[in-house]
Regions:
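Intrinsically disordered, glycine/charged-rich C-terminal tails and inter-domain linkers
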Residues: 7, 11-29, 46, 349-361, ...
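Extended, non-transmembrane interaction/recognition domains
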Residues: 267-269, 289-290, 295-368
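Acidic/His-rich, divalent-metal-binding segments that scaffold phosphate/diphosphate chemistry
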Residues: 361-489
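An active-site-proximal "capping" alpha-helix that borders the catalytic cofactor pocket
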Residues: 415-425, 487-503, 566-583
Length: 631
C-alpha cells in the first residue's frame, strides 16, 4: 500500500522539477554571450529530458491510485492529495489539465462525505482549471467551467455556516469568473451573465453577506471586479460582437454613472479612478451626445497615458484589459471622430505600439492561458489589422507580436524558412514545373520570372506555418513531463488554429500551409483529417514546408526534443523510405541527388543552427528587455 509519505515525496519532487524547469526557461531570456546561451539551452534540454520520466511516473501512479486502487485509500490519503491539489491551485502553476483531472478524481470522495467546505474548494478548483482551458479549447471543457462555478454558487445561502473564512471567498470567486470571464470565453450567455450580475448586485445590499467584508476583504473587491466586468462587456460590445438588450444597456448606463461619481469622490485624482469606470462613463456621454467623440478621445487619451504612469501603485490590476481592450477602444473611438486622417494615424500607431509592446512582454504579468486569449483577440482583430497600410506591415506586426512571443516556436520557424529557401533555390534550377498546379494559371516561363516572389512567399509561409502553436503556448511549454492525452489533442489543433488566425484577406494565402503542414503527401495520414492537401492550390509549398518541418524537428539537438535527436543521414534515409506516401518524391530525390543541396541542408541543421538560434534569441531578448523597461 502506498504510504502518505510516498505521496508527499512524489508531489514535492514534482513541484521542484516544475519550478526548476520554469527557472531554466527564464534564464534563456537573460543577456548572455553566445557560448553561455547555447550552454544554457543545452542544460535546459538535458534537465527536462532527465525529469520527464520521473514526473510522468508521478502522474501515472497518482492516476492509478485514484482510479484502480481507490479502495485502498484512507481518509488521510485523500486529505494528503487534497493538500497538494490546493498547493497546485494557489501556486498558479499553469497546469490546469493536471489540476482539473485531480479535482475531478477527488470530488466523488468528498461528495460521499458531504464535506461542504472541501467541496467548495474542489468545485472552484475544477471551475478555474476548465475556465483556463476554455481560453484555448472551444470544446466541452467550456461547459465544465459553468457547471462547477454554478455548483459553488449553489452553496451561497450557507455562507454564514462556513468555518473556514476562505470558503466564503470561493462563492464570490465563482460569481466573478462567471460574470467577468464566462461571456467572453464563450461558456456563459450574455443573458446568464446579466442575471448573475443583478443577483450579485442585490446580495451586496444584504447584511447576511456584507457582514463578512472585514473578515474577508477580498469579497468586496471580487464583487466590484465582477460587476465592472459586466460593464466592460457593454463597453466592448462593438469589439466583441455582443448584443446587449435595451434593459441590459440601461442597467449598465445607470450603474456606470453611479460608479463614476462614487469613484471620482473617493479617488485621489481623476487619474486614480478605475480605468473601466472612466472609459465606460465617457463612452456613454459621447453616445448620448453630451460631449463629442473628439472631446471623449481627448479626455481618454490624456487619462490613458497618465494612468499608465500610475500602474505601479495599483494592486491586483487587470493589465490585459488596460493594454489590450482599452487601447482597442481608443482606436475604435478615434474612428468615430472627424479628426484629420494624419492625426488619427499618429494616434493609432501610438496605441498599437503600446499594445504590441505589452503583448511582447505580458508573460511577466499574465497567466499563459490568459496571454493566449489576449494575444489572439488583439493581434488578429479586424480593428487592428485594418490600421496597417499594406500587407508587409501587417505581416511584420504578426511575426513580431505573435510568432516571436514563444522563443522555441520562433527558432523552429526560422530554421524551416532557411531550409525551405535552400530547397526552393534548387527547385527553380532543376524542377520548377512541380510548382505549377492546375489552379496556378501561369506558364513555366511566367513562373520563372517570379522566383523572388515565390521565394518570399515560401519564407513567409515557413515563418507563419506554426502560428497556431502560439494559441496553445501553455501546452507546448510543458516540458518537465509528457503531455496528457487531452493536451496532445489540443496540440493537434494548432494547424486549425493557425488557419483561423490567418483568415484575414492578406494572410489567406498562407492558410493552407498552416492547415496542411502535418498532412502526408498522399493525404492519407496526418491532421487535420478533413483538410484535403492533395487538391490545395498551394500543395507544392505545403509539401516543401512539410519536409522542412520534419527535417528540423528530427535534427534539433538544442531545443526541447534533445533526447530524441536523429542524425541528418538518418533523417534522409527516412525521407527516402517514405517518399511518395509521407513526402513529395520529387523533393526527396532532389535533395538526395544533388550533393551541394544535401551538404547545405546538413550544414544548416548541424553547424549553422547555433548561429541561427542565437540571432533569433538576440532579437527576442533585446525586444523583451526593451519592453520590460517600457512596462
Amino acid at each position: 500500500m502506498v504510504s502518505i509519505d510516498d505521496i508527499s515525496y512524489a508531489f514535492k519532487n514534482y513541484f521542484s522539477n516544475f519550478i526548476n524547469s520554469i527557472s531554466l526557461d527564464e534564464k534563456l531570456l537573460a543577456p548572455a554571450p553566445k557560448e553561455e546561451w547555447i550552454r544554457r539551452l543545452q542544460d535546459c534540454a538535458r534537465f527536462q529530458a532527465s525529469v520527464r520520466q520521473e514526473d510522468q511516473h508521478v502522474i501515472h501512479s497518482l492516476n492509478t491510485l485514484l482510479t484502480e486502487q481507490s479502495d485502498t485509500l484512507t481518509a488521510a490519503h485523500y486529505d494528503t492529495i487534497l493538500k497538494y491539489c490546493r498547493k497546485l491551485y494557489y501556486a498558479n502553476s499553469n497546469e490546469p489539465p493536471i489540476l482539473l483531472d485531480l479535482a475531478q478524481k477527488l470530488i466523488p470522495h468528498y461528495e460521499r462525505l458531504d464535506d461542504t467546505e472541501n467541496l467548495l474548494f474542489l468545485y472552484c478548483c475544477a471551475g478555474y482549471a476548465s475556465s483556463q482551458l476554455s481560453r484555448i479549447d472551444s470544446g466541452n471543457v467550456r461547459k465544465l467551467s459553468s457547471y462547477y462555478y454554478k455548483k459553488v454558487i449553489s452553496y451561497r445561502d450557507e455562507i454564514d455556516t462556513f468555518q473556514n473564512p476562505v470558503s466564503r471567498d470561493y462563492i464570490f470567486i465563482a460569481y466573478n469568473n462567471l460574470i467577468r470571464i464566462g461571456t467572453r470565453a464563450g461558456w456563459l450567455t450574455l443573458e446568464e451573465s446579466y442575471s448573475l450580475c443583478q443577483e450579485l448586485y442585490s446580495i451586496r445590499c444584504q447584511k447576511k453577506f456584507r457582514q463578512f467584508d472585514k473578515s474577508n476583504p477580498r469579497i468586496p473587491s471580487l464583487c466590484k471586479k465582477a460587476i465592472d466586468g459586466f460593464l466592460n462587456n457593454d463597453c466592448l460590445a462593438d469589439l466583441e460582437g455582443f448584443s446587449f438588450t435595451e434593459n441590459m444597456h440601461q442597467f449598465c448606463i445607470t450603474l456606470s454613472k453611479k460608479r463614476f461619481k462614487e469613484d471620482r469622490t473617493k479617488a485621489k485624482s481623476f487619474y486614480h479612478c478605475p480605468a473601466s469606470t472612466v472609459f465606460q462613463y465617457y463612452k456613454i456621454l459621447a453616445e448620448e451626445g453630451s460631449i463629442s467623440w473628439e472631446e471623449a478621445c481627448e479626455i481618454l487619451d490624456d487619462y490613458y497615458f497618465k494612468k499608465e504612469k500610475l500602474l505601479s501603485e495599483e494592486i491586483d490590476f487587470d493589465h490585459l484589459t488596460f493594454y489590450v481592450d482599452f487601447a482597442m477602444l481608443l482606436i475604435s473611438f478615434l474612428n468615430k471622430t472627424s479628426l484629420p486622417a494624419s492625426k488619427k494615424k499618429a494616434k493609432i500607431v501610438q496605441y498599437r505600439l503600446l499594445l504590441k509592446n505589452f503583448l511582447s512582454n505580458c508573460q511577466t504579468v499574465l497567466e499563459r492561458y490568459t496571454l493566449c486569449e489576449g494575444l489572439y483577440f488583439a493581434t488578429f482583430h479586424p480593428l487592428i489589422l485594418e490600421t496597417f497600410e499594406n500587407p508587409v506591415e501587417k505581416t511584420n506586426f504578426i511575426i513580431d507580436s505573435v510568432v516571436s512571443s514563444h522563443l522555441p516556436t520562433m527558432t523552429h520557424s526560422v530554421m524551416v524558412s532557411y531550409l525551405a529557401e535552400a530547397i526552393l533555390k534548387h527547385v527553380f534550377l532543376y524542377c520548377p514545373e512541380i510548382l505549377i498546379t492546375p489552379k496556378s494559371h501561369m506558364t513555366l516561363d511566367e513562373l520563372l520570372t517570379k522566383q523572388p516572389q515565390v521565394t518570399d512567399y515560401a519564407v513567409q509561409a515557413a515563418l507563419l506555418h506554426d502560428i497556431g502553436k502560439n494559441g496553445i503556448v501553455p501546452v507546448i511549454m510543458t516540458q518537465h513531463r509528457n503531455l496528457t492525452d487531452y493536451e496532445y489533442s489540443l496540440l493537434k489543433m494548432h494547424p486549425q488554429k493557425g488557419a483561423d488566425y490567418l483568415s484575414d484577406r492578406d494572410f489567406i494565402v498562407y492558410r493552407d500551409i498552416a492547415l496542411g503542414h502535418h498532412k502526408s503527401y498522399d493525404g492519407k495520414r496526418g491532421y487535420p483529417v478533413d483538410f484535403d492537401n492533395v487538391h490545395s492550390p498551394y500543395r507544392p509549398i505545403i509539401d516543401l514546408i512539410h519536409i522542412c518541418d520534419c527535417i528540423d524537428a528530427a535534427t534539433d539537438y538544442l531545443s526541447r526534443n534533445y533526447n530524441r535527436v536523429k542524425s541528418f543521414a538518418t533523417v534522409m534515409e527516412e525521407l527516402e523510405a517514405e517518399k511518395g506516401t509521407e513526402y513529395n518524391p520529387v523533393l526527396v530525390d532532389l535533395i538526395l541527388e544533388h550533393d551541394d543541396l544535401y551538404r547545405e541542408l546538413r550544414f544548416l541543421v548541424e553547424q549553422k543552427r547555433e548561429d541561427i538560434y542565437y540571432d533569433v534569441y538576440l532579437t527576442f531578448a533585446n525586444k523583451h528587455v526593451a519592453n520590460m523597461e517600457h512596462l
